[in-house]
Structures are given as C-alpha cells and as structure tokens.
Swiss-Prot record:
The keyword Hydrolase does not apply. It catalyses: L-seryl-[protein] + ATP = O-phospho-L-seryl-[protein] + ADP + H(+); L-threonyl-[protein] + ATP = O-phospho-L-threonyl-[protein] + ADP + H(+). Residues 254-617 are cytoplasmic. Disulfide bonds join C25-C93, C29-C155, C91-C153. It comes from Arabidopsis thaliana (Mouse-ear cress). Forms homodimers and homooligomers. Homodimerization is required to trigger plant defenses. Binds to chitin, chitosan and chito-oligomer oligosaccharide elicitors. Interaction with chitin octamer (NAG(8)) promotes homodimerization while shorter chitin oligomers inhibit homodimerization. Interacts with Pseudomonas syringae hopAB2/avrPtoB. Interacts (preferentially when unphosphorylated) with PBL27 at the plasma membrane. Binds to IOS1. Chitin binds at Q109, E110, D111, T112, Y113, E114, R115, P137, A138, T139, N140, I141, P142, L143. This is Chitin elicitor receptor kinase 1. The gene is CERK1. Lysin motif (LysM) receptor kinase that functions as a cell surface receptor in chitin elicitor (chitooligosaccharides) signaling leading to innate immunity toward both biotic and abiotic stresses (e.g. tolerance to salinity, heavy-metal stresses, and Botrytis cinerea infection). Recognizes microbe-derived N-acetylglucosamine (NAG)-containing ligands. Involved in the resistance to pathogenic fungi Alternaria brassicicola and Erysiphe cichoracearum, probably by sensing microbe-associated molecular patterns (MAMP) and pathogen-associated molecular patterns (PAMP). Autophosphorylated. Autophosphorylation is induced by chitin and derivatives. Ubiquitinated and targeted to the proteasome by hopAB2/avrPtoB of Pseudomonas syringae pv. tomato DC3000.
Length: 617
C-alpha cells in the first residue's frame, strides 16, 4: 500500500491547489515603502543601517532611494524629530502566502526583541514576529548575531481600485486616525478602509497599508498580475484534467505493481524530475554505489540534498550519446546539451574529471540555495565524466540577446527587469545564505532568460563561500572584462560580483561586449568600463552617453532611465571596492528605476514629438 499512498499524495496536493487557486500572494511587486517614524535622535544613517538602503557615499550620483521619496528633506543630516521618512524596499512573496521583505539586523549591546521592533524598526515589525523568525531565546540573544526582520507590505488590490499600485507600510501611532491619514495621504477614507478591512485606525498600534506616491508625486497605477499568466478558470480546467489523468495512472500503475512487484524501479524513474527532486532525501555520493570509477574522494564524500542521481545510460540516451545536434552551449568547464528527462526539459553540463573543483562548487551551492532568480539544479551523474543537470531555460542567455544576430532587440523595460531579476539572485547569495557565497563569474553569458524574459543567474563553478561581510584571498579567476581590479591580487569579496554586475548594466545599455574593439586595427581593444568612464568625463555627459546607447533601441526608451542605470553602473565599477554599493542597495535602486520605467510604453504614443520628449531626445 506504500506505493498507492505515494501516488495519492500529489493528487491531494493538486486538489489543495485547485481550491486555493486565487492565492493571496500571486506575485511580488518591485517596490513598497516603509513609513519610519523618527524619534530619540534617529538619523538617516540609522535608518540606512537598519533598513539596508545605502545613502552615503552614493548620493553624489543622485540615485539615493530614500531622498527620492522624501522631497521634503533638504538636509539629510538635519531632520525634524517626530516626522516620518519613507524608505523604499522590495515587496516579495514569502513562505506562507503573504508579502514582505526580510531585512538583516546585527544585534548590539542591550538589544531585546522588543527594543529592536520598537526603537530600531519603528514598529514596522513586532516582538512576536522577531521571536517566531529567529532561533535565539528572548532572554539570551547573542551579541553581533544576525536577526531576520520581516516587514510586511502590499502590492494593492484591483478589486478595490486600479488607481493605486505603490503602498506604504504604515505603523499606526496614538495621534493617528482615519481622517488624519486620509488628509496626509490624499486618499479618501473609504479607499483606506477598503484596503484595510476591519482595521481600527484609532487604535494607536498595528500596521495599515496606505497608497503611496512616486518621486514625481503621482500615484502609480495597479499592475495586474494576470497579464503574464492565465486565468483562474483555465488553471482550474488544467488541474481537473491533470487530476483525472493521475487517477487513471494510479489505477494502471498500481495494477502493474501488484502484478509484478519487481517493476517498482521502473515506476520510480517515471516520476517527474521536479517532484522527485523536491522529495529526494539527502544522500551521499560515497554510499549506495553512486561513485563511479575515477571519482575523486572529494566528490565521493559530498552530501547532496534534493537532487536526483542519474545514470550515464539515461543521460546518453536522452542526448543520442551526446550528439552535436543536442549541444546548446560551451563553457570554460564543459559542453552543455539539451535533453528531455522523465518528462521535463533539461540542460546537461558535461565536465571532465579534471574540473572536479568546479563541479563540487556548483553542486554545493545549488543543492543548498534555492531562489526564483537562480537556475535550478535537478540532478547529477559521476560516471565516466561529471554531469550536472539543470532546468532548461528556453530563451538562451543575455549575451546572446545583446550581442548575437537574428534576435529581436530587447525593449528597455525588459532590460531593466532583467537587471532587477539578476540583482535579486545575487542579493540572495550575498545576503540571505549561510555561509555567504560569491559567484566570481558574473557576466551576460551567465544570465539566462526564460520564456517571459525573466532572468536567472547560472554557472556557479567559480563560487566561493566567505564569512558575512568578509573576504578571502584566492587566485585571480573570472572572465576578462568583468574582473574587478582587486582580483589581480587574489582578493575575493561580494564586491567582486558587484563590479561585474556593473559591467552587465553597461552591456544592457550599449549592447556592446565587456571588451570592445575600438578600430579595425589589430590589438585596438578597450574594456567597456573604460568606454563609459570616458563618456562621464565629457562636458556634455548626456550627449556622450547617447552615442553609446544600443542603436537598435531607436527612440524607444526614456533617456532619464538609461542615464540612471549608467550612473548605477558607474557606482558598481568604482576602483575602490569599499565605495561600491551592496547588492541590497542595487536591488532597491533598480526596483525604484523599474517602478518608474514600467509605466513608460512608447507604443502608447503616436505623436512623434511626444515620443521624442519621452525619450529625452
């Protein structure tokens, strides 16, 4: 009966999905705002530290997100106590079907959960939330420990109004009321109450969600999550069909199982990869005969979580013995082949045994780290050669879209989205994993694009782990044109990835490679960073930048958005690693940029003069 139960489980899961098809957390939104009440000598520096949104030294490039949303602040060093500061942050789906963002807080002397919630986070979170999301007892929080601080957020509700798409997470205070918040926000009391049903605005505590304004003072409209997906009715139809099919499979397979129990193994290999990978127990390559001849002890001893072990026979069969017609790419450590394995499209990287360090690096990272903007590892094989099996990402890599021929040019809004997705993937491995990982080979060729033109960071073969905020000394590794200056001395830190990401931002703007051929003469090459640095030195910086913007964009871009991305690229590629922003800052900056760029669609403008005005030309 064990087999029968295992088949019923996914069916029950599908039933639960059917009844919960209208999820409260169908999608995230690029940006939300936190209302931080200033008291007891709180400064922007404190807010910056607690909510991880850098101010200095990047405000010289006029890209500071806090100041953009607080035009009333004339001097960041002198702010009136008792006022509120709006702090932008990403609003993301969290486990448990709700929206929020996890900030990291380093515990200081005399900190308690209550003090952190009230004093350090201005009631944007609660003591109960901190206790629930951190392993430390309330009476013994270690000094310098890192706390996960959840701040909830909202992306709006089109059933209430489509006029509002940016929301402020607003902690209520004793002096607040429904009418006072309506006056200060410019939103009717009825709308506020409908966005916060059942909430008593006069309670003096708790969180409400208030429509917010963009840096131009306008209310961004709600962006429906349905535009890129399918309706609930379609989903319901698909689910019902799948359930019927699974019931039929249950009957056939269980009948065959009872008839011949020896065929149980063939059933195991028929389970879809995504299901099997999610439920595979942690195994060791040393046990169970998984190691093949020639496998090094280091490989044989690695522990693998949630990954499928494939046989060489199965991989060879799926690729016609690794026929060239199945080859879809070639990297520094091996070739990549397309395959269909157990009903799922996959990409197989075949590596020589000499690349065991790179194999282990990818295996260790991708079996422990899971994020929507990181490529998913399905499984591995260590017979004869080293094989890693990934999810197949249909649209190739970013470099192919920017530098290759035969593809439609990426619209500017998609370029900003790809930059934001990639930044979120990197922020995750830099900020939210223990230990912290440094990718060390960020480049456009290692950013994969799916069918919806969303990005996933891939190729973790050079990844190194470091202590939080730390660095390590290693050999210089990476790709020429993307390597930060300090890598010459073997220094590795998260700022190495930041530098390379800055080069990718320049690529998104110009569609040029990281190394540019300046003339037809032999040897006339220059780094893309140098090309942009030269443009920033020109008297007319804007005109100089226009000359290197991808000509395939034509007039279909808002110049202000391009200029701001170029300035962010400049901040990322500063020679001094300490002056580069963190990936957390970059995510907030790009979220802000995407929020303003996403509303811009040149296709809505038929008048050529309007098009020129919008593009800044």
């Amino acid at each position: 009966m064990k087999l029968k139960i295992s088949l019923i489980a996914p069916i029950l899961l599908l039933f639960s999905f059917f009844f919960a098809v209208e999820s409260k957390c169908r999608t995230s939104c690029p940006l939300a705002l936190a209302s931080y009440y200033l008291e007891n000598g709180t400064t922007l520096s404190v807010i910056n530290q607690n909510l991880n949104s850098s101010i200095a030294p990047y405000d010289q490039i006029n890209f500071d997100p806090i100041l953009r949303y607080n035009s009333n602040i004339k001097d960041k060093d002198r702010i009136q106590m008792g006022s509120r500061v709006l702090v932008p942050f990403p609003c993301e789906c969290q486990p448990g079907d709700f929206l929020g963002h996890n900030f990291s807080y380093s515990v200081r002397q005399e900190d308690t959960y209550e003090r952190v919630a009230i004093s350090n986070y201005a009631n944007l979170t609660t003591m109960e939330s901190l206790q629930a999301r951190n392993p430390f007892p309330a009476t013994n929080i270690p000094l310098s420990a890192t706390l996960n601080v959840l701040v909830n957020c909202s992306c709006g509700d089109e059933s209430v109004s489509k006029d509002f798409g940016l929301f402020v997470t607003y902690p209520l205070r004793p002096e607040d009321s429904l009418s006072s918040i309506a006056r200060s926000s410019g939103v009717s009391a009825d709308i506020l109450q409908r966005y916060n049903p059942g909430v008593n605005f006069n309670s003096g505590n708790g969180i409400v969600y208030v429509p917010g304004r963009d840096p131009n003072g306008a209310f961004p409209p709600f962006k429906s999550s349905k535009q890129d997906g399918v309706g609930a009715g379609v989903i319901a139809g698909i689910v019902i069909g799948v359930i019927v099919a699974l019931l039929l499979i249950l009957f056939i397979v269980y009948y065959a199982y009872r008839k011949n129990k020896s065929k149980g193994d063939s059933f195991s290999s028929s389970i879809p990869l995504s299901t099997k990978a999610d439920h595979a127990s942690s195994t060791s390559l040393q046990s169970g005969g998984l190691g093949g001849a020639g496998v090094s002890p280091g490989i044989a001893a690695i522990s693998v979580d949630k990954s499928v072990e494939f046989s060489l026979e199965e991989l060879a069969k799926a690729t016609d013995n690794f026929n060239l017609s199945f080859k879809i790419g070639q990297g520094g450590f091996g070739a990549v082949y397309y395959a269909e394995l157990r009903g799922e499209k996959a990409a197989i990287k075949k590596m020589d045994m000499e690349a065991s360090k790179q194999f282990l690096a990818e295996l260790k990272v991708l079996t422990r780290v899971h994020h929507v903007n990181l490529v998913r590892l399905i499984g591995y094989c260590v017979e004869g050669s080293l094989f890693l099996v990934y999810e197949y990402v249909e649209n190739g890599n970013l470099g192919q879209h920017l530098h290759g021929s035969g593809r439609e040019p990426l619209p500017w809004t998609k370029r900003v989205q790809i930059a934001l997705d990639s930044a979120r993937g990197l922020e995750y491995i830099h900020e939210h994993t223990v230990p912290v990982y440094v990718h060390r080979d960020i480049k456009s060729a290692n950013i994969l694009i799916d069918q919806k033109f969303r990005a996933k960071v891939a190729d973790f073969g050079l990844t190194k782990l470091t202590e939080v905020g730390g660095s390590a000394t290693r050999g210089a590794m990476g790709t020429f044109g993307y390597m930060a200056p300090e890598t010459v001395y073997g220094e590795v830190s998260a700022k190495v990835d930041v530098y390379a990401f800055g080069v990718v931002l320049y690529e998104l703007i110009s569609a040029k490679g990281a190394v540019v051929k300046m003339t037809e003469a032999v040897g006339e090459f220059r780094g893309l960073v140098g090309v942009f640095e030269e443009s920033f030195k020109e008297t007319d910086k804007e005109e100089a930048l226009r000359k290197i913007i991808d000509p395939r964009l034509g007039d279909s871009y808002p110049f202000d958005s391009v200029y701001k991305m170029a300035e962010l690229g400049k901040a990322c590629t500063q020679e001094n690693a300490q002056l580069r922003p963190s990936m957390r800052y970059i995510v907030v900056a790009l979220s802000t940029l995407f929020s303003s760029t996403g509303n811009w669609d040149v296709g809505n403008f038929q008048n050529e003069d309007l098009v020129s005005l919008m593009s800044g030309r």
